[in-house]
C-alpha cells in the first residue's frame, strides 16, 4: 500500500510502498479516506530535536484521519464493515492505575499512533477497536478528519465552566482558534485570542471570536478596557507554548482565575510565581483528549451548530502531499486535508 513515511533521519517525508498492516484479534482495519496534517507532523517533517529523540526511522506517520472499517478482529464487537470512523491516537496500556481507574487519558504508558507505531498517512491503518470512534452521519469527512486536534481544543476549553466568563486564548494556531470557538459557542461572554500571525488572527475573526488581537500592534490592557473588563480574565487557555504569551496571561488574569495549558514551551520557562500565589490561580495541564467523553462532546458541539468549516483552508490529493506540507510550514494556513480517495 502507499504510505507517507519518515524514511531518513533528515528533513522531509517520502511516499513509500509498505505492507498492509496485520489485523489483530482486538483490532479494526480501516481504509483511510482523508487525513489532516498536524503540527506534530510538521515537527517530524522538519526533523527537529524532539523528533530526533522520539521517532524511529523508518516510520509511517500521521494520526488525524477518517476512514471506513474494512476488517474486524475476531474478538471485536460493536462495529461492522462499512462503519465510518476516526480514532483516538493515544494507545493506552489498560493496566496502570489511571487506566484501571477510568482515567485512560492519563496513562503513563501511552503509545502514539504515527509517533511510536505506524500511523494513518497510508491507505490502511490498524488500531485497537477500543480506540475507534463512530462518526455520526451528519458530520462530514473533512470535519471528522480533524477530530483529533478538535479534541485537544475541546478538552482544553471545557476544563472549566465558561458560561458568562471572560476567556483569554493565547495562540491562534488551529487548535487555539477551535478552542476559542468552543468557548464562545458554550456561552463565554468575551473571548479574546492573541497571536502575532495576522493570517491566523483573520481566521479567528471568521470564526466569530469577540476579539483577535495582534499583540505586536495592540496592547491587551487597552482591549480589555474597550470590552468593559475591569477585573481581568476569568479563564485562560494557553495554546502557544510561547513564554511571553503565558507571562502576559498571568498579568491579565483575575484573582481566582483558572488556566488550562496545552501549548508546550520550547525549553524551561521562568515565570513570576508570586502572581500565581497571590492571585490564587489554578493551573491545569492538558494532554490529548479524555477517552471518550471528549469525543462525544466533539460530535455534540458540531451537531448543535458549532461551525468549524473556516478552519479548513487547504485541500489536496495525497499525490500532492508536498504542497500540503509546504502550506502547513508556511504559517499561512489553517488545517490542511489530504484526500486518499
Curated annotation (Swiss-Prot):
Keyword line: Cytoplasm, Metal-binding, NAD, Oxidoreductase, Zinc
GO function terms (MF aspect): L-threonine 3-dehydrogenase activity; zinc ion binding
Q: Which cofactor does it need?
A: Zn(2+)
A Gene Ontology biological process annotation?
A: L-threonine catabolic process to glycine
Carries keyword NAD?
Answer: yes
Query: Cofactor binding mode, per the note?
Result: Binds 2 Zn(2+) ions per subunit.
Provide the binding site for Zn(2+) 2: 93, 96, 99, 107
Tell me the compartments it is located in: Cytoplasm
Q: Under which EC number(s) is this enzyme classified? A: 1.1.1.103
- Positions that bind NAD(+): 175, 195, 200, 262-264, 286-287
**SUPFAM superfamilies referenced in this protein's UniProt entry, alphabetically:** GroES-like, NAD(P)-binding Rossmann-fold domains
Q: Which reaction is recorded as catalysed by this protein?
A: L-threonine + NAD(+) = (2S)-2-amino-3-oxobutanoate + NADH + H(+)
Q: Which PROSITE patterns match?
A: ADH_ZINC
Q: Where is the active site?
A: 40, 43
Identify the residues that bind Zn(2+) 1: 38, 63-64
Q: In which pathway does it act?
A: Amino-acid degradation; L-threonine degradation via oxydo-reductase pathway; glycine from L-threonine: step 1/2
Positions bearing the site annotation: Important for catalytic activity for the proton relay mechanism but does not participate directly in the coordination of zinc atom:
148
Does the keyword NAD belong to this entry?
yes
One Pfam family cited in the UniProt record for this chain:
ADH_zinc_N
Q: Which InterPro entries match?
A: ADH-like_C (IPR013149), ADH-like_N (IPR013154), ADH_Zn_CS (IPR002328), GroES-like_sf (IPR011032), L-Threonine_3-DHase (IPR004627), NAD(P)-bd_dom_sf (IPR036291), PKS_ER (IPR020843), Zn_alcohol_dh (IPR050129)
**What do the Gene Ontology cellular component annotations say?**
cytoplasm
Q: Tell me, in a sentence or two, what this protein's role is.
A: Catalyzes the NAD(+)-dependent oxidation of L-threonine to 2-amino-3-ketobutyrate.
Which family does this protein fall into? Belongs to the zinc-containing alcohol dehydrogenase family.
Q: How does it assemble?
A: Homotetramer.
The record, for HAMAP family, names: Thr_dehydrog (MF_00627)
State the name under which the record lists this protein: L-threonine 3-dehydrogenase
Species, as recorded: Escherichia coli O157:H7
**Gene name tied to this protein:** tdh
